[in-house]
Amino acid sequence: MKISAEQIQENWAQLQNVINTTYEGERLKNILLLHDHFKDRMMLAPASGTKWFHNAFPGGYTAHVLNVIKWALEYYKMFEKMDMHVSDLTKENVIFCAMFHDLGKIGDMDNDYYITQPDDWKAKKWGRPYDHNPELHWMSVTDRSFWLLNQFNIPMSQQEFLGLRMADGLYEDANKPYFFEGAEWKAIKSNIGFIIHYADSSATRWEKEQYMLS
């Protein structure tokens, strides 16, 4: 599965529009700087390295980000409709977390996270067209996302921190204390982490279906 060069350009333009209509002031300036720095990489990056995971093709990353934003806004509206606690959240909080939940998959300031699979056999037999770049320092995708945002002086609220931290749910061991609280005083006070995790899971499942049914 792949998308056209025209679709890649259209997705990038759509992401830029979301940025320009969501943020303002210093935050907008720095988020634009981040996207300008990584533009070529972001436009062509895959969302995963394995075909049957999701969006393992050029342009897959940006397409996934847009899908997660769409799903996150739908979950946000549904939570509000069902009288869940969302009074501590804004649309900007939700979009911010959806937009940057996988930022770590871009790599570091100079190096891609994914590289073209050097092993032809793995690419063909295992369906892995991409491999992880061994030149990078190892970090979880979430931790690298925080690090990259810090490089561009992009601060976040506590809610936004939780949204990014919890995005991968229990697929990431570091999230266990957030989902298995263990004590009443540790109970999560915001639903942002659940909204983003459900949005990421739903978008990923939808993308996987496009591959499975194509």
Please tell me what each predicted stretch does.
Residues M1, L213-S214:
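Short intrinsically disordered terminal tails
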Residues M1-A123:
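Acidic/His-rich, divalent-metal-binding segments that scaffold phosphate/diphosphate chemistry
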Residues N55-F57, A63, M84-M212:
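Divalent metal-dependent catalytic cores for phosphoryl transfer on phosphate-bearing substrates
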